[in-house]
């Protein structure tokens, strides 16, 4: 009997998060749904959200047809980097939440790097 796709993704995410917690740096966590993208930066111990951005916010939503394409990923990546730098965070660990580093996840990460985050 095989495990489900989402269960396998969550298992990969758990392993990654344990490794990142040992590093002791803030983590950029990404959630991808069929319609939207969400990005949050957590403290090193994972207890508090420092900055957040998603495709439901008006700064990102303006000018987009929908929140599930690569243009939306670029806007979310730039916005999360801008908000992180505003609170003094420039070095993070990227938590892709078990998703493949491909498509919207990769585009969001590249946009955040271009906007000044280091990971």
Swiss-Prot record:
GO terms under biological process: translation
Swiss-Prot/TrEMBL keywords: Ribonucleoprotein, Ribosomal protein, RNA-binding, rRNA-binding
Listed GO CC annotations: cytosolic large ribosomal subunit
Domain of life: Bacteria
Molecular function GO labels: 5S rRNA binding; structural constituent of ribosome
A family per Pfam: Ribosomal_L18p
Family annotation (InterPro entries): Ribosomal_uL18_bac-type, Ribosomal_uL18_bac/euk
Family named by the database record: Belongs to the universal ribosomal protein uL18 family.
Described function: This is one of the proteins that bind and probably mediate the attachment of the 5S RNA into the large ribosomal subunit, where it forms part of the central protuberance.
Oligomer and partners: Part of the 50S ribosomal subunit; part of the 5S rRNA/L5/L18/L25 subcomplex. Contacts the 5S and 23S rRNAs.
Protein name: Large ribosomal subunit protein uL18
């Amino acid at each position: 009997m095989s495990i489900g796709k989402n269960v396998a993704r969550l298992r990969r995410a758990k392993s990654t998060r344990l490794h990142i917690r040992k590093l002791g740096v803030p983590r950029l966590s990404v959630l991808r749904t069929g319609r939207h993208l969400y990005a949050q930066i957590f403290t090193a111990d994972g207890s508090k959200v420092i900055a957040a951005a998603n495709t439901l916010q008006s700064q990102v939503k303006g000018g987009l047809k929908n929140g599930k394409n690569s243009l939306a990923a670029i806007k979310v990546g730039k916005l999360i980097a801008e908000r992180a730098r505003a609170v003094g965070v420039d070095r993070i660990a990227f938590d892709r939440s078990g998703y493949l580093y491909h498509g919207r996840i990769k585009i969001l990460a590249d946009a955040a790097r271009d906007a000044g985050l280091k990971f």
